[in-house]
């Protein structure tokens, strides 16, 4: 199969979905960028740019915005879903009657679905064992759109789909590394958002660089425990989807999760912090999902548990830190 012959549909016109659409369209591929918001699509069609979520990066001629899901999927084999994790299942359900047996599903969504389900489990339940792939790694949308060097992991259950999708995406400025650990890649992408909130809170409380480094390192340990229980590979932890994305998300203020944590650490109300950011904060939703998963399987994740208490039980951030500092010494 020559992957460039057919258009590719990207479902989700936020900053990350748009950035991936630009990567593909700049390589001359026909890209259909779908949004459920008709007024947003009207704006993109009229202005030739996504001014709402990724301004200053004009659409190439081969990138078209769609609001009609059926039209966006017509004649398409490869679909790339880039919606918030809480909307992932709904999008799969909506597209189910519109696709055929040749369809291949990829996603750039980072998180778990309702019921603490991994996204590949949602796809398999609704669509069967179709070719699937997940894209993850340290990839700020604005830098991808600006054509700054970026490297990501792509994990798939199908070698041909993996090869074709890498060929679609890979370039000198957007490097795609093959991975076969879908479970590890998905779980790392879920936990890193929670840890970004934690490091943001720490920095908002002015706890210093040492504390930030400790949180990232101990957070990686928590991530590893979760990945291990579900059969993911430890090598994934030190790769782009694990350590790479974790470091970026925890240290760069372009990260929405980190900015949200910073605001909480500075004493800003949770709802006010959400409104100020204006886009989905995956860690806010996924803290609940990962916390439930850790409880169910008795996985020790103290940082995740404290972030959950701050977000869902109104625990004061200062008190959360104090309780962590009072924990008994452990072997590293």
UniProtKB/Swiss-Prot annotation:
GO molecular function: glycerol-3-phosphate dehydrogenase [NAD(P)+] activity; NAD binding
Keyword NAD found: yes
Catalytic activity, as annotated: sn-glycerol 3-phosphate + NAD(+) = dihydroxyacetone phosphate + NADH + H(+); sn-glycerol 3-phosphate + NADP(+) = dihydroxyacetone phosphate + NADPH + H(+)
Active site: 192
Gene Ontology biological process terms from the UniProt entry: carbohydrate metabolic process; glycerol-3-phosphate biosynthetic process; glycerol-3-phosphate catabolic process; glycerol-3-phosphate metabolic process; glycerophospholipid biosynthetic process
Binding, NADPH: 15-16, 110, 141, 256, 282
Listed InterPro entries: 6-PGluconate_DH-like_C_sf (IPR008927), 6PGD_dom2 (IPR013328), G3P_DH_NAD-dep (IPR006168), G3P_DH_NAD-dep_C (IPR006109), G3P_DH_NAD-dep_N (IPR011128), NAD(P)-bd_dom_sf (IPR036291)
Superkingdom field: Bacteria
Residues engaged in binding sn-glycerol 3-phosphate: 110, 137, 139, 192, 245, 255-257
Subcellular location: Cytoplasm
Intrachain disulfide bonds: none
Keywords noted in UniProt: Cytoplasm, Lipid biosynthesis, Lipid metabolism, NAD, NADP, Nucleotide-binding, Oxidoreductase, Phospholipid biosynthesis, Phospholipid metabolism
One Gene Ontology cellular component: cytosol
E.C. no: 1.1.1.94
SUPFAM superfamilies: 6-phosphogluconate dehydrogenase C-terminal domain-like, NAD(P)-binding Rossmann-fold domains
UniProt pathway: Membrane lipid metabolism; glycerophospholipid metabolism
Family in the record: Belongs to the NAD-dependent glycerol-3-phosphate dehydrogenase family.
Function recorded in the entry: Catalyzes the reduction of the glycolytic intermediate dihydroxyacetone phosphate (DHAP) to sn-glycerol 3-phosphate (G3P), the key precursor for phospholipid synthesis.
Protein name: Glycerol-3-phosphate dehydrogenase [NAD(P)+]
Species assigned in the record: Coxiella burnetii (strain RSA 493 / Nine Mile phase I)
Organism placement in taxonomy: Bacteria, Pseudomonadati, Pseudomonadota, Gammaproteobacteria, Legionellales
